[in-house]
A protein has these predicted regions:
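Serine-esterase "nucleophile elbow" of acetyl-processing enzymes
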Residues: 17-68, 78-86
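Alpha-helical cap/lid subdomain in secreted, periplasmic
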Residues: 21, 48, 58, 74-204
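Bacterial Sec-dependent signal peptides at the C-terminal "C-region" and cleavage site
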Residues: 1-23
Length: 204
């Protein structure tokens, strides 16, 4: 009996370790727009983008670190966890909730810049997702909000998606009932938009 137990112990010890996925990581880092709020599992843009990349023969693995309701302050607090993933590329999609809450754009800019700088220092290529807001937030605030993304992209030489929800926001064909969050069809448009900016980086 002891011999059998010993043999089983040895066999367990020599079991091969799980093989880690060797593909470089593209990190989808954002809020509900990245998390895939309100759509069936697999319908969000990170999952759709993974299927697109697989079909095109790109050997990358997408990690979804989207959290619904997150702000740039929340993203900054999660920064080390994001770096621990050791991404090669990050799609940084944060700021919409800051704008909807009327957070000062100086704070938005400082938070985004801290994340951008940390990613770049770690050798991560950053794609910045730009945002806009409903005009009832006031023309001056909306203009200042939009300029944060343009300014940071220019300052840090980042590929910029001018408006992450281009063709989606406000269109009931592509959104949930809130006219903001994409539905599954809306995420097809978002995925294509991200891929358009991402693919030139992958081809380098």
């Amino acid at each position: 009996m002891m011999f059998l137990i010993s043999m089983m112990t040895v066999l367990l010890m020599i079991q091969p370790l799980p093989v880690q996925d060797p593909r470089p990581v593209i990190l989808a880092f954002g809020d509900s727009l990245t998390a895939g709020y309100g759509v069936p599992r697999g319908s969000g843009y990170p999952e759709q983008l993974q299927r697109k990349l697989d079909g095109l023969g790109y050997k990358y693995r997408i990690v979804n670190m989207g959290i619904s309701g997150d702000t740039t302050s929340g993203g900054r607090a999660r920064l080390q966890s994001a770096l621990n993933v050791v991404p090669s590329i990050v799609v940084l999609e944060l700021g919409a909730n800051d704008g909807l809450r009327g957070i000062p754009t100086a704070q938005l800019q400082a938070n985004l810049e801290e994340m951008i700088t940390a990613f770049q220092k770690a050798g991560v290529k950053v794609i910045l997702a730009g945002m806009t807001l409903p005009r009832n937030y006031g023309g001056a605030y909306v203009q200042s909000f939009e300029e944060v993304f343009r300014g940071l992209a220019k300052k840090h030489s980042l590929p910029l998606i001018p408006f992450f929800l281009e063709g989606v926001a406000g269109n009931p064909k592509y959104t949930l009932d809130d006219f903001l969050h994409p539905n599954a069809d809306g995420y097809v448009l978002v995925t294509n938009l991200v891929l358009k900016t991402l693919e030139p980086i992958l081809k380098k």
